[in-house]
């Protein structure tokens, strides 16, 4: 029985590369001279440090195109609130969402069941396994999910015949 997986993954080495390039651009910009503006990468979080909300906004405008050029979908970022960290320094955390969250997975499974396509969908951890009788039905399921779920980056892989 043919099947495929719906998942959401981020290429972490490409993300690190994008952060490094953004930091080089930030350190070379005139309007950031003398400030402690930088982007730090944690396990699944990016932290922007700056002197003002304007600087943090400018750093986002540098970082996001770098991520796009490295083929990282920026919809995987969840923006945190601006936080004061002593003096006139600010930070903002950008959480990198990896894996399909449970509520989104349930929404996708419900979407596939309500579509009357002859497919079975099962949540398997941070991925969704979709199986059907024919490859054509699976392709229709992919098209349906791509059309309906636009606010979160999804990848379709692990095809089996």
Curated annotation (Swiss-Prot):
Q: Which domain of life is it from?
A: Bacteria
**Has UniProt tagged this entry with the keyword Nucleotide-binding?**
yes
Please provide the record's keywords in A-Z order: Nucleotide-binding
Which GO terms of the molecular function aspect are on file? nucleotide binding
Is Nucleotide-binding one of the keywords UniProt gives this record?
yes
Q: Where is the signal peptide?
A: none
Q: Do you know which SUPFAM superfamilies this protein is assigned to?
A: YajQ-like
A GO cellular component term found in this entry reads: cytosol
Cross-referenced NCBIfam families, in alphabetical order? PRK05412.1
As for what it does, the entry says: Nucleotide-binding protein.
Record's PANTHER family?
UPF0234 PROTEIN YAJQ
Report the sequence similarity comment from the record: Belongs to the YajQ family.
Name assigned to this protein: Nucleotide-binding protein AZOSEA28950
């Amino acid at each position: 029985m043919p099947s495929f997986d719906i998942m959401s993954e981020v290429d972490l080495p490409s993300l690190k590369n994008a952060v490094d390039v953004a930091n080089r651009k930030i350190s070379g910009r005139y309007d950031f001279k003398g400030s402690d503006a930088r982007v730090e990468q944690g396990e699944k979080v990016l932290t922007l440090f700056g002197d003002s909300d304007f600087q943090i906004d400018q750093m986002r405008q540098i970082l996001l195109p770098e991520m796009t050029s490295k083929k990282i979908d920026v919809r995987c970022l969840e923006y945190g609130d601006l936080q004061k960290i002593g003096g006139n320094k600010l930070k903002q955390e950008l959480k990198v969402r990896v894996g399909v969250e449970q509520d989104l997975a349930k929404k996708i499974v419900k979407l596939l069941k309500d579509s009357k396509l002859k497919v079975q969908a099962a949540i398997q951890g941070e991925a969704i396994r979709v199986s059907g009788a024919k490859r054509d039905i699976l392709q229709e399921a992919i098209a349906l999910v791509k059309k309906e779920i636009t606010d979160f980056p999804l990848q379709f892989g692990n095809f089996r015949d």
